[in-house]
Amino acid sequence: MAGVGGGNDFQWCFSQVKGAIDEDVAEADIISTVEFNYSGELLATGDKGGRVVIFQREQESKNRPLSRGEYNVYSTFQSHEPEFDYLKSLEIEEKINKIRWLPQQNAAHFLLSTNDKTIKLWKISERDKRAEGYNLKDEDGRLRDPFRITSLRVPVLMPMDLMVEASPRRIFANAHTYHINSISVNSDYETYLSADDLRINLWHLEITDRSFNIVDIKPANMEELTEVITAAECHPHQCNVFVYSSSKGTIRLCDMRAAALCDRHSKFFEEPEDPSSRSFFSEIISSISDVKFSHSGRYMMTRDYLSVKVWDLNMENRPVETYQVHEYLRSKLCSLYENDCIFDKFECCWNGSDSAIMTGSYNNFFRMFDRNTRRDITLEASRESSKPRAMLKPRKVCTGGKRKKDEISVDSLDFNKKILHTAWHPKENVIAVAATNNLYIFQDKMN
């Protein structure tokens, strides 16, 4: 990858936008997670209404040579329904918190989806043939009159219109007391972990009635609680290693070979705080909202409220790279605290070669950082630049003084428009960005 934009780097252009244009967006239609599968041919989104929509990539052809960044609806299904916990008198939302794909082993695709309490394994498969000529049933499924059956028929498979079916294969429930914030498929592709505020469980994909509790930070007295688990992920190559982040801005790396209960970490990553910059908001903005291993497994990336940090797994005392996402908001923390925006959980993602990273911001802005050149760019997901192949213009935020023509004032940013969820194609420069109820797909400009 050459870079993320600006100078001699390639530039990004609009490919598609999915979703309605309505000003009044229904809460159920807000996208809550975005995830490419391992090949990048499928793209899944989950929303607050418990639905999963899967998009399939359009194949390039001679007639449409530039359609590589185009995805069309492949399957839509209701993954979770709202429930009620009668023991605790609590409503359980249907909102999809996370989707994780499993590597494809055969013609079918499998993914895990979770709401606050229940994880489901879904099988997505295609059918283009159907059996006809049953002896005891008509073509529409009704039982035939036994007296009318005069000959033995051999059922045959006949072609039919392609149908994509989504069926739940496993339901993993009743293992989390608190809200699930993360699921991560292990590199053995047989197990996965799920994390809530205080515990992390290890599951086998074939076994639904039990899981192993591998982390438990719940104190004997809940009044002594000082931090919660905010995210967790398995190492991409070592199936015994995983990390989890906390609301105190720390990351713990654990090795399951050391003990069955990984309460004692193998490595502890924390950046010392500068006492001169300490404020009332310091602990809130240091809370980590996302942690992602690089594809190589050498680095991991964490996202807090104002920055993205890249850590070398061999160096625990400080990150090797720090990127400021929206430092201009530091002076606005008081008002962001009052409107609860300071608690927004932004995610982050790597490109396929680990040379660039992407994360979201407010005003439907999203940021990219090139790790090699240290260049960065701010782009906007907007319908105003949604003409096919339209180039995305870099955006700049002005913090004070005279504002240039192409700059936007920090005071005019719309904090209701926020990009929390982004995904980068695992092999190419195609990105998916969720902006409220719309899914934007962009690709690099091909010369």
Swiss-Prot record:
Record localization: Cytoplasm
GO biological process, any: mitotic cell cycle
InterPro entries reported in the protein's UniProt record: PP2A_PR55 (IPR000009), PP2A_PR55_CS (IPR018067), WD40/YVTN_repeat-like_dom_sf (IPR015943), WD40_repeat_dom_sf (IPR036322), WD40_rpt (IPR001680)
GO cellular-component term (any): protein phosphatase type 2A complex
Keywords in alphabetical order: Cell cycle, Cell division, Cytoplasm, Mitosis, Repeat, WD repeat
Start-end of each WD repeat: 26-65, 91-132, 175-213, 224-264, 283-321, 338-379, 414-447
Top-level taxon: Eukaryota
PROSITE patterns, per database record: PR55_1, PR55_2
One GO MF term: enzyme-substrate adaptor activity
Keyword Repeat in annotation: yes
PANTHER family: PROTEIN PHOSPHATASE PP2A REGULATORY SUBUNIT B
Family to which the UniProt record says this protein belongs: Belongs to the phosphatase 2A regulatory subunit B family.
Stated role: Substrate-recognition subunit of protein phosphatase 2A (PP2A) that plays a key role in cell cycle by controlling mitosis entry and exit. The activity of PP2A complexes containing PPP2R2D (PR55-delta) fluctuate during the cell cycle: the activity is high in interphase and low in mitosis.
Subunit structure, as described in the record: PP2A consists of a common heterodimeric core enzyme, composed of a 36 kDa catalytic subunit (subunit C) and a 65 kDa constant regulatory subunit (PR65 or subunit A), that associates with a variety of regulatory subunits.
Protein name: Serine/threonine-protein phosphatase 2A 55 kDa regulatory subunit B delta isoform
Lineage: Eukaryota, Metazoa, Chordata, Craniata, Vertebrata
